[in-house]
């Protein structure tokens, strides 16, 4: 089957490479000539474990190609995916759908053969209706159906998530469109991956509801962590104790500095805007957004408290900048607010991240980027572990004691055993643990 993937960013590139690996003939399309040329040369625009190798293998096999020419690329494609960005619109938090609608207009002008048009981008309820209207109003006589197929990929584990999904959600009620989508996902269908067919609007809402629920779990355990600190309980024990209940589950119950990234902040705001537009407020999600925003700054204040309440003139080493490990994504990363809180208090900040420093340097120019963790730690009055990269899970504390100006560690991801770190002679602060 020929598949056209419009948009070669994170979702489009991962999805396109995985579809090609399934045996489909895939062309990834993007207006950015520089990006397409780089992809042709094997240079990835993002860091995702295994992606460069997957792309190279499928390009070599002749199943994956890249183009800036949408009209030529969609010719004879049976499925055309829209995988362009939907960033938060400035001012109101609604998803900016201008890129999606621009693609719909271009498809309307160039569609020559029957195709199922699939919105892979995360879009608010009713977007598929508008995409369909744009194309139908062009007067095209070519058969097409608009389908919703949201992605549920985790950055850092996207390839595994795509190939071994918990479920595949497809918003399509037309029998022909359902048949095309079954063929698209045939390898997973044969492996008995759950495929849920719903209405298009239900599919669009499922994506937002899922992300809002996960954001709620994260925020809940973070608030429990704060309570644990007050009452002398251990949030990790609390998390295990409730997570063993099958009705709750253990995932997303790890206390930390709050959620960030390209999905949860954007999607919770978009859901709130949709709820407002339909006069059906979701107060729980409103509270989640508010609590999470305040938490990031609170983690900066926690670091200042570990410094004795005074950060002016102090040197703070940050380990990890990206919103999670195994990605270079700095979007809405907790480190941004933590750094700003420290800088506002007069601290000097030195940081190291295995993959995120290039992106971080552009948004936090006042921060000194170190070549490795130990270089960041040298002369530091406090060490703040922000992102739980594997590279930070086995630090040499004897070496750190020699390098650091003061043995103070703030572990915002609860990576270490408090007794172990204290035994090494450190003043140790973690999240939600006595």
Pin down the residues of each PLM region:
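Structural/interface elements that position substrates and couple domains in central-metabolism enzymes
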Residues: 1-434
């Amino acid at each position: 089957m020929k598949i056209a993937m419009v948009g070669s960013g994170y979702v489009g590139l991962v999805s396109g490479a995985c579809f090609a690996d399934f045996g489909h003939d895939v062309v990834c399309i993007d207006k950015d000539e520089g990006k397409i040329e780089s992809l042709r040369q094997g240079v990835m625009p993002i860091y995702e474990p295994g992606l460069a190798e997957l792309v190279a293998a499928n390009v070599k096999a002749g199943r994956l190609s890249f183009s800036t020419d949408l009209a030529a690329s969609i010719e004879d494609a049976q499925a055309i995916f829209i995988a362009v960005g939907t960033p938060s619109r400035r001012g109101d938090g609604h998803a900016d759908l201008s890129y999606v609608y621009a693609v719909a207009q271009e498809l309307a002008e160039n569609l020559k053969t029957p195709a199922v048009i699939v919105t892979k981008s995360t879009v608010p309820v009713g977007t598929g209706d508008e995409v369909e209207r744009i194309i139908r109003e062009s007067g095209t006589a070519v058969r097409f159906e608009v389908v919703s197929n949201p992605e549920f990929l985790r950055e850092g584990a996207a390839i595994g998530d795509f190939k071994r999904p918990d479920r595949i959600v497809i918003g399509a009620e037309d029998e022909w469109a359902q048949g095309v989508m079954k063929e698209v996902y045939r390898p997973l269908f044969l492996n008995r991956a759950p495929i849920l067919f719903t209405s298009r609007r239900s599919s669009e809402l499922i994506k937002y509801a899922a992300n809002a629920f996960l954001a709620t779990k994260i925020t809940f355990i973070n608030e429990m962590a704060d309570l644990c600190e007050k009452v002398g309980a251990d949030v990790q024990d609390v998390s295990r104790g409730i997570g063993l209940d099958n009705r709750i589950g253990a995932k997303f119950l790890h206390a930390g500095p709050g959620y960030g990234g390209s999905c949860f902040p954007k999607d919770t705001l978009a859901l709130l805007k949709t709820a407002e537009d339909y006069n059906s407020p979701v107060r729980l999600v409103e509270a989640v957004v508010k609590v999470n925003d305040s938490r990031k700054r609170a983690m900066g204040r926690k670091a200042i408290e570990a410094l004795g309440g005074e950060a002016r003139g102090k040197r703070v080493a940050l380990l990890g900048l990206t919103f999670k490990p195994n990605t270079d994504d700095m979007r809405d990363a907790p480190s941004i607010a933590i750094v700003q809180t420290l800088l506002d208090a007069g601290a000097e900040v030195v940081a190291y991240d295995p993959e995120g420093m290039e992106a971080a340097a552009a948004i936090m120019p006042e921060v000194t980027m170190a070549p490795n963790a130990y270089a960041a730690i040298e002369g530091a009055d406090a060490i703040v572990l922000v992102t739980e990269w594997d590279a930070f899970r086995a630090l040499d504390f004897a070496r750190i004691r020699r390098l650091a100006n003061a043995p103070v560690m703030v572990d915002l991801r609860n990576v270490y055993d408090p007794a172990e770190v204290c035994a090494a002679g450190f003043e140790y602060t973690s999240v939600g643990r006595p």
